[in-house]
Amino acid sequence: LLNYLIPQTPKKLKVVFLYPREPKTSAWLYSHELGRMYLDETFSDKLETEYVAGVDENNVEQVLEDIIKAGADIIFCVGPQMMPNSLKVAVEHPEVYILNCSLNAPHPYIRTYYGRMYEAKFLAGMIAGAVTDNERVAYIADYPIYGMIANINAFALGVASVNPRAKVYLAWSKTKDYDRNKFLTENDLHYVSDQDIITPNDASRYFGLYKLQDGQALNLAMPIWNWGVFYEKLLQSVLAGSYKAEGQEQVKALNYWWGMSAGVIDLICSKHVPYGVKRL
């Protein structure tokens, strides 16, 4: 009788993030970790979150089984390498929502998600093409994987759209012979598009689009990932009961590929971008 008279506290959803390593050691993972913490603040009365680090293709099956047994309702696998083995677990546990952050093809049992960073890169390219003082712009990338090529192409198209004479010089920062200063000096490059995300342990100002001035980086624009916004929108659909409905009938597999219009991707300009350029 007391159970009917005393209001029951709704069960909180348990949301778990799986990372290949500790988020503070990776700029990419740290951006997702900020998103996880944003969820904690936004839905403190409706869900609880946690993360597990050190998850790869070799142990993801066991990790998934363990956290599902511990009560996980929604699981975000932040690593494309987790996709194949995660699928096996997802088929056996359709009651749990498992998503993979990648451009991998989605499956009826696992949805994938990513962001349209190329939209912000195109705009950053327009800025670079408008302000370059010698028709040269540098683009420093890390790995030629997933959306990276699309980002590079979008940036180059942005440059060309306002300055057809300008050239984009590309360097891969993870190659053995990479020498940042040598690359920039030998090619007389003053404007640089560099890494988009920094880690808590890295106070470098060499990120986003910047101008090299007296050996220092003068930051101009910064493409950003708003993973908190993405996770918030997705969790709202779960809480509203519309998540399952999205995958019914004609649509059997879903990919969430959101960009600037959804608020997942953005471009922040500093005061050093000329007013006329901002109006482009």
Language-model segments: what does each one mean?
Residues 2-280:
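A residue-level marker of the well-folded mature domains of exported/periplasmic proteins
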